[in-house]
Amino acid sequence: MVKAVAVIRGDSKVSGTVTFEQANENTPTTISWNITGHDANAERGFHVHQFGDNTNGCTSAGPHFNPFGKTHGAPEDDERHVGDLGNFKTDAEGNAVGSKQDKLVKLIGAESVLGRTLVVHAGTDDLGRGGNEESKKTGNAGPRPACGVIGIAA
């Protein structure tokens, strides 16, 4: 079992943790999140981005992690970036707790997300269905108020 964590923080009140667990290279990865300080009663996009570089804040993380050269999509779509995790829902206080399994996100192997950045966005991910060019790149999820590098967890 490989475990990883991203400690989320940035130039906003958004903070928290996103954890990853994968039993072996052929099993889905369980992704769990506990994020606070976001907009109340909202859906907000989150993605694994290409680089683990946060020297210029979350903008240094680059585009979505996309080793297979696909366009942006929903986590359940065949046509999607590896880093496309969709949206999480916040409660009346702006907090979000949840988990999901993902068959493309890996901690083991050549396409591992270890050392890359998990970015929490300011807007809702349109899952590549926005009808414009940016939708197929970013899901129109907006600015990057918080992020964290995905590192090996104890």
UniProtKB/Swiss-Prot annotation:
Annotated positions binding Zn(2+): 64, 72, 81, 84
Main location as per UniProt: cytoplasm
Stored InterPro entries: SOD-like_Cu/Zn_dom_sf, SOD_Cu/Zn_/chaperone, SOD_Cu/Zn_BS, SOD_Cu_Zn_dom
Binding site for substrate: 144
GO CC annotations, alphabetized: cytosol; mitochondrial intermembrane space; nucleus; superoxide dismutase complex
Compositional bias segments (type: Basic and acidic residues): 125-137
CDD domains found in the cross-reference section: Cu-Zn_Superoxide_Dismutase
Keywords: Antioxidant, Copper, Cytoplasm, Disulfide bond, Metal-binding, Oxidoreductase, Zinc
One GO biological process term: intracellular copper ion homeostasis
Molecular function per GO: copper ion binding; oxidoreductase activity, acting on a sulfur group of donors, oxygen as acceptor; superoxide dismutase activity
Cofactor: how bound: Binds 1 copper ion per subunit.
Xref: Pfam families: Sod_Cu (PF00080)
Location relative to the cell: Cytoplasm
Enzyme Commission number(s) from the entry: 1.15.1.1
Region (Disordered): 125-147
Reactions accelerated catalytically: 2 superoxide + 2 H(+) = H2O2 + O2
Disulphide linkage map: 58-147
Protein's UniProt keywords contain Lipid biosynthesis: no
Keyword Metal-binding: yes
Subunit relationships: Homodimer.
Purpose of the protein: Destroys radicals which are normally produced within the cells and which are toxic to biological systems.
Family recorded in the similarity comment: Belongs to the Cu-Zn superoxide dismutase family.
Protein name per the record: Superoxide dismutase [Cu-Zn]
Annotated source species: Aspergillus niger (strain ATCC MYA-4892 / CBS 513.88 / FGSC A1513)
